[in-house]
Amino acid sequence: MARSLKKNPFVANHLLRKINMLNTKAEKEIIVTWSRASTIIPTMIGHTIAVHNGKEHLPIYITDRMVGHKLGEFAPTLNFRGHAKNDNRSRR
């Protein structure tokens, strides 16, 4: 279900503070965050944000096409390695 348009998009306060600080300094550095639920807003464009996937932080470069999506959409948490082999010997 989509968030109501009456509300602003959710962005974690610590993440918003870091983005605004880097924008005023005009610096680019990797921002480490665990906030996968934060929505990407236009002030984040051009920054690299390392999003936690449960094991490590994956660096994601924010582009204009990502605006409106959540940070967690770009850091997959599951790593599918294929189905188990059909081992008939173990069925005995």
From Swiss-Prot:
Among InterPro entries, the record links this protein to:
Ribosomal_uS19, Ribosomal_uS19_bac-type, Ribosomal_uS19_CS, Ribosomal_uS19_SF
Q: Where in the cell is it found?
A: Plastid, Chloroplast
Pfam families per record: Ribosomal_S19
Any one GO BP annotation for this protein? ribosomal small subunit assembly
Asked if the record carries the keyword Ribonucleoprotein, the reply is yes
Q: Name one cellular component (GO) term.
A: chloroplast
- The source's domain of life comes to Eukaryota
Offer an example of a GO molecular function term for this protein.
Answer: rRNA binding
Key words, A-Z: Chloroplast, Plastid, Ribonucleoprotein, Ribosomal protein, RNA-binding, rRNA-binding
Per the entry, what this protein does is:
Protein S19 forms a complex with S13 that binds strongly to the 16S ribosomal RNA.
The UniProt family comment states:
Belongs to the universal ribosomal protein uS19 family.
Name this protein carries in UniProt: Small ribosomal subunit protein uS19c
The source organism is: Morus indica
Taxonomic classification: Eukaryota, Viridiplantae, Streptophyta, Embryophyta, Tracheophyta
